[in-house]
C-alpha cells in the first residue's frame, strides 16, 4: 500500500525580541500618524496585575453606573462569572482564622490602585469613549459582558469588566513568550506591562484586513471579519494597492522586524490606510483564510500582486453568528450575574423549569 502523501508541518521560529517588538508601545510612536489616537499607561502597578489575575471582578464604587450594582463578581469553576458563590461565602461564618489568613488579599480599585483608576477616568473624560488593550491583545472575546456588545468603554468599570473577562488578556499576562525558541522563565517577569486606551471610533468590520509579511514581502492579505460582503470583491485591486503602498513605503522602512502580521483598516473613500495592530509572525496569530503552513512554505511570485482572500459567498452557518459568539451568553444571564436579586430569580426559574421537565419525563415513562 502506497504511503499517503502529506505536507510536513513547517517550523515557524519566533524569538522573545520579536514578541517585544510587537508590543504596542514599541511601535506606536513610529506610526502615530497612521494609527488611531491612544494613551499608553505604563508601568502598571503590581496591584493592578494581581487584580486582573484574581478570581473575581471587584468594580469601583465611585462609578455612578447602576448597570453593575457596585459589587464583586466571582469566577466559578467553569470560568464563568456570578455573585452566587460570593453570597454563599458571605453566609458562612465557620471559616477559621487560619483559612482567612491563607487567602490572598483581594484587590479593590480605589484601595489598591487609586492613582491608576483616576488616570483611566481622566483619559475617558478626554476621549469620551475608549477601547482598551494590553501590550499585544485587545479583549475582543469579552465584548459580550458589556451592554453594548462592543469594546466601547464609557466608564472605568467597563474597562475592568472587559479586561477581567478576556482570555486574550490572560494570555498576554501569563503566556506571551510560550512559543519563543529562546524562551526564558524570566521573560514574563521582566516585561513592562502597559494599558493602552485608544480613542473609540466606529469601524466597519468588512474593511479590516490582516496582512502577512515574510522576509520584507507581502505573502498574503486576508479579510478579517469572516462574513460575506458583496461589495468587497470588485474592490480587491484597490485594497491590494493601498496595502502594498502602506507596507512598502511606510511600515518596512520604519520597523525593525522583517516578518510580522499587520492589522489594517481601509476607510472609505479608500484613499488611506490605518494601522490597527502589529502581531508576531507566529502560529499564535490567527492566519484567518490562510494556513500557517502555506504562509511559511509557499513560493512568492515576485511579478504578481500579493494574494488577497475574501469570503466570496454566503456561509449561512457563519453569517448568522458574531465573532467570539462562543463566549457569549444570553443578556438575562449577564444581567443576573451583575445583580444578586436577579441571580436568585433566574436560578429559581431554572429550578422550576427543571422540575417541570423531570415531571414530564416521569409521566412519559409511565
From Swiss-Prot:
Give the GO biological process terms: eukaryotic translation initiation factor 2 complex assembly
What job does this protein perform?
ATP-dependent protein-folding chaperone for the eIF2 complex. Binds to the gamma subunit of the eIF2 complex which allows the subunit to assemble with the alpha and beta subunits.
Q: Name one Pfam family in it.
A: D123
Q: Which UniProt keywords apply?
A: ATP-binding, Chaperone, Cytoplasm, Magnesium, Metal-binding, Nucleotide-binding
Chain sites annotated for binding Mg(2+): 277, 279
**Entry keyword annotation includes 4Fe-4S:** no
The question of whether Cytoplasm is a record keyword is answered with yes
Give the protein name, as stated in the record.
Translation initiation factor eIF2 assembly protein
**Recorded GO terms, molecular function?**
ATP binding; magnesium ion binding; protein folding chaperone
Q: Where is this region: Disordered?
A: 79-108
Family, per the entry? Belongs to the CDC123 family.
Amino acid at each position: 500500500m502506497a504511503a499517503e502523501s502529506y505536507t510536513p508541518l513547517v517550523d515557524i521560529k519566533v524569538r522573545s525580541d520579536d514578541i517585544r517588538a510587537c508590543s504596542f508601545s514599541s511601535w506606536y510612536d513610529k506610526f502615530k500618524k497612521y494609527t488611531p489616537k491612544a494613551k499608553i499607561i505604563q508601568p502598571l502597578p503590581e496591584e493592578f496585575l494581581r487584580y486582573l489575575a484574581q478570581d473575581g471582578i471587584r468594580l469601583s464604587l465611585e462609578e455612578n453606573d447602576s448597570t453593575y450594582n457596585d459589587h464583586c463578581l466571582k469566577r466559578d469553576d467553569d470560568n464563568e462569572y456570578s455573585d452566587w458563590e460570593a453570597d454563599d461565602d458571605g453566609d458562612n461564618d465557620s471559616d477559621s482564622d487560619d483559612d482567612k489568613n491563607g487567602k490572598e488579599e483581594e484587590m479593590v480599585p480605589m484601595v489598591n490602585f487609586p492613582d491608576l483608576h483616576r488616570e483611566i477616568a481622566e483619559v475617558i473624560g478626554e476621549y469620551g469613549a475608549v477601547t482598551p488593550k494590553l501590550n499585544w491583545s485587545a479583549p475582543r472575546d469579552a465584548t459580550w459582558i458589556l451592554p453594548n456588545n462592543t469594546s466601547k468603554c464609557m466608564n472605568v468599570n467597563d474597562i475592568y469588566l472587559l479586561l477581567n473577562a478576556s482570555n486574550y488578556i490572560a494570555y498576554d499576562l501569563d503566556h506571551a513568550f510560550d512559543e519563543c525558541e529562546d524562551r526564558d522563565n524570566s521573560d514574563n517577569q521582566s516585561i513592562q506591562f502597559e494599558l493602552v486606551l485608544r480613542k473609540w471610533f466606529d469601524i466597519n468590520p468588512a474593511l479590516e484586513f490582516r496582512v502577512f509579511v515574510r522576509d520584507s514581502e507581502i505573502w498574503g492579505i486576508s479579510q478579517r471579519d469572516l462574513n460575506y460582503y458583496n461589495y468587497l470583491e470588485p474592490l480587491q485591486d484597490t485594497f491590494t494597492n493601498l496595502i502594498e503602498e502602506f507596507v512598502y513605503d511606510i511600515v518596512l522602512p520604519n520597523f525593525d522586524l522583517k516578518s510580522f502580521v499587520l492589522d489594517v483598516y481601509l476607510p472609505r473613500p479608500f484613499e488611506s490606510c490605518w494601522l490597527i495592530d502589529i502581531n508576531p509572525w507566529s502560529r499564535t496569530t490567527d492566519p484567518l483564510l490562510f494556513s500557517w503552513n502555506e504562509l511559511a512554505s509557499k513560493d512568492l511570485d515576485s511579478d504578481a500582486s500579493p494574494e488577497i482572500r475574501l469570503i466570496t459567498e454566503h456561509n449561512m452557518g457563519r453569517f448568522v453568528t458574531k465573532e467570539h459568539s462562543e463566549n457569549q451568553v444570553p443578556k438575562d444571564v449577564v444581567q443576573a450575574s451583575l445583580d444578586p436579586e436577579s441571580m436568585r430569580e433566574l436560578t429559581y426559574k431554572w429550578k422550576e423549569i427543571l422540575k417541570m421537565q423531570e415531571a414530564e419525563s416521569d409521566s412519559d415513562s409511565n
